[in-house]
């Protein structure tokens, strides 16, 4: 059971204020190719980039290991934290009150 309830409007604003390209770029180096951003996946070892970030759709996906999701999911995986902590991190970045 989650400790906190986040109204859908607040959660949507959190994701809107945290552009996925900006957040992912704060952890790894992305290279733009066309409409996508590419990098070697931070979640498995690889030599050829298979990790993509789609700014328009605000999601990420790795064609190598299959991991993917939205900005909250990315922070959960990078920080090895739960959803509550990821939301707290993103709210702080966006200057939003919890």
What are these regions (language model features)?
Residues 1-98:
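N-terminal structured subdomain of primase-like DNA metabolism proteins
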């Amino acid at each position: 059971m989650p400790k906190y309830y986040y109204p859908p409007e607040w959660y949507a604003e959190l994701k809107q204020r945290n552009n996925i390209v900006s957040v992912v770029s704060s952890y790894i180096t992305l290279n733009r190719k066309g409409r996508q951003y590419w990098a070697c996946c931070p979640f498995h070892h690889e030599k050829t980039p298979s990790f993509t970030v789609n700014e328009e759709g605000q999601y990420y996906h790795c064609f190598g290991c299959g991991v993917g999701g939205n900005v909250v999911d990315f922070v959960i995986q990078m920080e090895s934290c739960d959803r509550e902590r990821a939301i707290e991190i993103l709210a702080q970045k966006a200057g939003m009150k919890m």
